[in-house]
Curated annotation (Swiss-Prot):
Protein name in the entry: Pesticidal crystal protein Cry19Ba
InterPro entries reported in the protein's UniProt record: Galactose-bd-like_sf (IPR008979), Pest_crys (IPR038979), Pest_crys_dom-III (IPR005638), Pest_crys_dom_I (IPR005639), Pest_crys_N_sf (IPR036716), Pest_cryst_cen_dom_sf (IPR036399), Pest_cryst_dom_II (IPR001178)
Function noted in UniProt: Promotes colloidosmotic lysis by binding to the midgut epithelial cells of mosquitos. Has larvicidal activity against Culex pipiens molestus, but not to Anopheles stephensi.
Encoding gene, per UniProt annotation: cry19Ba
Origin species: Bacillus thuringiensis subsp. higo
Family under the similarity heading: Belongs to the delta endotoxin family.
Length: 682
């Protein structure tokens, strides 16, 4: 229990309060960063310029986060279905309001400011020159398609709609792509490029869904389907490559800019790119236009470092690599925050957070709590411990901090003195508080303005939030007890803590949600929505799942491999099934691209329900080398999928595709248990 829980003893500040003086009146931007700059030798005019620069950017982030957050929430089914998917997306970028639309311009201006890159009006005009025409063309197409759906005989004809689709396809590929990839501005335009690519792929998805009824010959439907797969690969690789190029350039500026770029491009680019494969109706069928996939993003993002402007806590006082190790986590199995042990210390009359330890558990592994390494100074330096506990079904969905202000003569502590955690179980909200207000000391409040509702257009509430706190990092080693740096890690709220399998959707579970603490997790390539599991030879993956109804499903796996080999899969030791994998790439596993991954049908069929006591999936690697596992997919029987040569992936030559209804499969899932199965404790 938190020993500082009695809120009556302390003042609880209004989050909207804005106490302004020279050192803190400009907006607390960017994001979670302490807004103060180095003020030593700063003149009044310089300070005014800093204020104006920060104010210029303050209108941009909300638009960027709204776009990225809304797209992700819509595709992942986190906000209600209202009308056709593409029509909804168009209204996101071109709201039906009388004022001039500035969504695209706001996004571009914000990223230019983030990158500190000059953006001329001429460049902005060139980049957005075709957007008005695109808007009109998309609106006409959406109206025609809606009329055709209402009455396929008396309103808009299939021929008319086909002409709109053909024209839009050319407009996207010829004009919009080039507009959003202007030389020298590729990174500035990247969120806009990803958003336009999303619109284009949704258009091509419509052809796959409605093309036959619209009167397209089967050869034309197949052509557009392969166009969709081609541009999915092209857009994914372009976005990831451009992102990485910009990320590399940020290393030369400093870690804070590097981390800020990484976070905001994840929210506005990489999260969207991770959704592109879900639009493939051959792999994820849809007859009603909806996406019937339960998917999630397991990537982790990091706040700006509180006190990153304080001498001794950041580059150049420490190396870039050291900062990365202090303020972020290495690739790891997905974890759920259970609570903290905090150590509070004092120097003279300054009381502060001097160290802490994260407590967490793995997915569907609430019975085993792990303690992370202690960060900062423990009680051997004096001070006392206190605890904050989070119940198994609850998460921290919002927080703010107070730390002492760094002011002349820069000799007093600048550490955190208070943290306010907002905790939810999705039915109610509660507050848990570390520390207290220090009314006689100058303090600075830090909020995290990327913590928003699911759609990214408003504040969080206990049942509507886009991220949860996953870890807290403390640097107390580079400048003694008076100066600590703090960063916070967050994961997306789409992640299901129980790996729930539902009977009416294809369910994707990322392999990083394994319940094995020693799993070999490697950094993701950027387009997968998270990190990857590297399954070594004769090693296994264990994944706990939850069935909410009696059902029968089969399993396929998204993987990458530079070798051929054999694997084995089962659930609860029932009917272990061997299947073969083929090489998907000749690249090193650190350089994987979109096309290096394939889906393999394991031919394993499982029947079970909530009454089964052990629902644990086991996947063994008997190949002569490591295999990269991205996701495990659970497919209810009866869903018809496209296959190519036994693999659920598209044929690069577009000639080898056929349909198989899994409900008619002749596989005997009651075959005798293979006595090979050995103890997994070896």
């Amino acid at each position: 229990m938190n020993s500082y829980q009695n809120k009556n003893e302390y003042e609880i500040l209004d989050a909207k309060r804005n106490t302004c003086h020279m050192s803190n009146c400009y907006p607390k931007y960017p994001l979670a960063n302490d807004p103060q700059m180095y003020l030593r030798n700063t003149h009044y005019k310089d300070w005014i310029n800093m204020c104006e620069e920060a104010s210029y950017a303050s209108s941009g982030p909300s638009q960027l986060f709204k776009v990225g957050g809304s797209i992700v929430a819509k595709i992942l089914g986190m906000i209600p279905e209202v009308g056709p998917l593409l029509s909804w997306m168009v209204s996101l970028f071109w709201p039906t309001i009388e004022e001039k639309n500035t969504v695209w311009e706001d996004m571009i201006k914000y990223v230019a400011n983030l990158l500190k890159q000059e953006l001329t009006n001429d460049t902005l005009n060139r980049a957005t020159s075709n957007l008005s025409g695109l808007n009109e063309s998309l609106n006409i197409y959406n109206r025609a398609l809606a009329a055709w759906k209402q009455n396929k005989n008396n309103f808009a004809s299939g021929e008319l709609i086909r002409s709109y689709i053909n024209d839009l396809h050319i407009l996207f590929t010829r004009d919009i792509q080039s507009d959003f990839s202007l030389g020298g501005y590729e990174t500035v335009l990247l969120p806009s490029y990803a958003s336009a690519a999303n619109l284009h792929l949704l258009l091509l998805r419509d052809v796959a869904i409605y093309g036959k009824e619209l009167g397209y010959p089967s050869t034309d439907v197949e052509f557009y389907y392969n166009e969709q797969k081609y541009y999915t690969e092209k857009y994914s690789n372009y976005c990831v490559n451009t992102y990485k190029s910009g990320l590399e350039s940020k290393k030369q500026i400093g870690w804070s800019d590097f981390n800020r770029y990484r976070r905001e491009m994840t929210l506005s680019v990489l999260d969207i790119v991770a959704l592109f494969p879900l639009y493939d109706t051959g792999l994820y069928p849809s007859k009603d236009g909806k996406i019937h996939v339960k998917a999630e993003l397991t990537r982790e993002i990091y706040s700006d470092v509180i006190n990153d402007h304080v001498y001794g806590l950041m580059v150049p006082y420490i190396s870039f690599e050291h900062a990365e190790s202090l303020y972020t986590r290495r690739p790891h199995a997905f974890t759920w925050l259970k609570g903290f042990r905090f150590v509070t210390n004092s120097i003279n009359s300054w009381t502060f957070l001097s160290g802490g330890e994260n407590r967490y558990f793995l997915t569907h592994g609430e019975g085993t709590i792990y303690n992370g390494p202690f960060l900062g100074q423990d009680t051997e330096y004096g001070g006392t411990s206190s605890y904050i506990d989070i119940s198994n079904n609850s998460s921290i969905y919002n927080l703010w901090t107070k730390n002492y202000e760094w002011i002349y003569p820069w000799t007093d502590p600048v550490n955190i003195t208070k943290i306010n955690f907002s905790i939810t179980d999705n039915s109610n909200s509660s507050e848990s508080i570390y520390g207290a207000e220090r009314m006689n000391k100058p303090t600075v409040r830090t909020d995290f303005n990327f913590l928003l509702n699911r759609a990214g257009n408003g504040p969080t509430t206990y049942n509507d939030y886009n991220h949860i706190l996953s870890y807290m990092l403390i640097n107390g080693e580079t400048f003694g007890q008076k100066r600590h740096g703090y960063s916070f890690a967050f994961t997306h709220s789409s992640v299901d803590r129980y790996n729930t399998i539902v009977p009416d959707k294809i369910v994707q579970i990322p392999a990083v949600k394994t319940n094995l603490v020693g799993a070999n997790i490697i950094k993701g390539p950027g387009h997968t929505g998270g990190d990857l599991l590297k399954l070594e030879y004769e090693r296994f993956l264990s994944l706990r799942i939850k069935l909410i109804a009696s059902m029968t499903f089969r399993i396929r796996i998204r993987y990458a491999s530079n070798i051929s080999g054999q694997m084995m899969i089962n659930i609860g030791y029932q009917n272990p099934t061997y299947f073969n994998i083929i090489p998907t790439t000749s690249r090193d596993y650190t350089e994987l691209k979109f096309e290096d991954f394939q889906l393999v049908d394991t031919s394993y069929i499982y029947s079970g329900g909530p009454s089964i006591s052990s629902n644990t999936l086991w996947l063994d690697n008997f190949s002569n080398g490591p295999v990269i596992i991205d996701k495990i997919e659970f497919i209810p029987l009866g869903i018809t999928l496209n296959q190519a040569q036994g693999y659920d992936t598209y044929d690069q030559n577009a000639n080898g595709m056929y349909h198989q209804n899994y409900s008619n499969s002749g596989y005997n899932y009651n075959q005798e248990y293979n006595t090979y199965y050995q103890s997994y404790n070896n």
